[in-house]
C-alpha cells in the first residue's frame, strides 16, 4: 500500500481552515471535500485544491428523484473533480441517468454509490431502518444495483470490501472510509479496520480524516501513517 491510496478527509468548517490544513500537508495528494466544507466554503475550495495540483473526492452524497440527481451530477461535473458520491438507495433509474450523463463528458468524475453509512450497524439497520437483511448482504445488494446501473464504484466499510470485490469484479472502484490506524480512536464509525488490511481486502482507496486532521500535529500524524504503510 502507498500514500497515493489514502484520501484525507478535509473535515473543517470553512475555507481558511481548509487551506491552512492543505498547506501544512503538502505530501497529501488526494483530499475529500464533504458537506460541511462545501456548504461552508462553496466551490472555491475545489478551485484552491486544483490550483495546488490535488485530486478531489467530492463527497456530497446526492439522494433525490432521478431528474434532480441528474442535474446535480451534471453541475458537479463542471468542477472536474475525480470522485463524486450519490446514494444507491435513490434507485436504478436515478443511478442509470447519472451514469449515462457522465459518459460523453470530457472530464467526468467517477461516480461512487453510497451503499450504507459506516456509522450504521446491524441493530440500526434492522430496528430503525426496518431492513431485514444483515449489513453485509444489504451492502452487497446496493453495490450490485449500482454496478448494474453503470456506476463506477461504491463506498463501503472495509468489512464488506472482499465480498464486493468478488461480486462486482476487478474494475469496480471500492473506496472505504471506515479505516483508522491502530494508534487512533474509532470515533463514531462502527465498522472499522486498519488501512493496510482494507487495501489487502480489495479496496482501491481508503479515507482517513480525524486521525490526521484532528491531531495536534497533523504533519506528524501523516508521517506516522506513511511509516505504517511502508511496513
Swiss-Prot record:
InterPro entries, per database record: Aldolase_TIM (IPR013785), OMPdecase (IPR014732), OMPdecase_AS (IPR018089), OMPdecase_bac (IPR047596), OMPdeCOase_dom (IPR001754), RibuloseP-bd_barrel (IPR011060)
Subunit structure, as described in the record: Homodimer.
Catalytic activity: orotidine 5'-phosphate + H(+) = UMP + CO2
SUPFAM superfamilies in UniProt: Ribulose-phoshate binding barrel
Cross-referenced CDD domains: OMP_decarboxylase_like
HAMAP family: OMPdecase_type1_B (MF_01200_B)
Superkingdom of the organism of origin: Bacteria
BP-aspect Gene Ontology terms: 'de novo' pyrimidine nucleobase biosynthetic process; 'de novo' UMP biosynthetic process
GO molecular function: orotidine-5'-phosphate decarboxylase activity
Protein keywords: Decarboxylase, Lyase, Pyrimidine biosynthesis
EC number, UniProt record: 4.1.1.23
Keyword Magnesium: no
Residues given in the record as substrate binding sites: 11, 32, 59-68, 118, 180, 189, 209-210
One Gene Ontology cellular component annotation held by this UniProt entry: cytosol
Classification via PROSITE patterns: OMPDECASE
Full protein name: Orotidine 5'-phosphate decarboxylase
Catalytic class of the enzyme: lyase
Record function comment: Catalyzes the decarboxylation of orotidine 5'-monophosphate (OMP) to uridine 5'-monophosphate (UMP).
Entry similarity comment: Belongs to the OMP decarboxylase family. Type 1 subfamily.
Cited Gene3D superfamilies: Aldolase class I
Active site: 61 (proton donor)
Pathway where it operates: Pyrimidine metabolism; UMP biosynthesis via de novo pathway; UMP from orotate: step 2/2
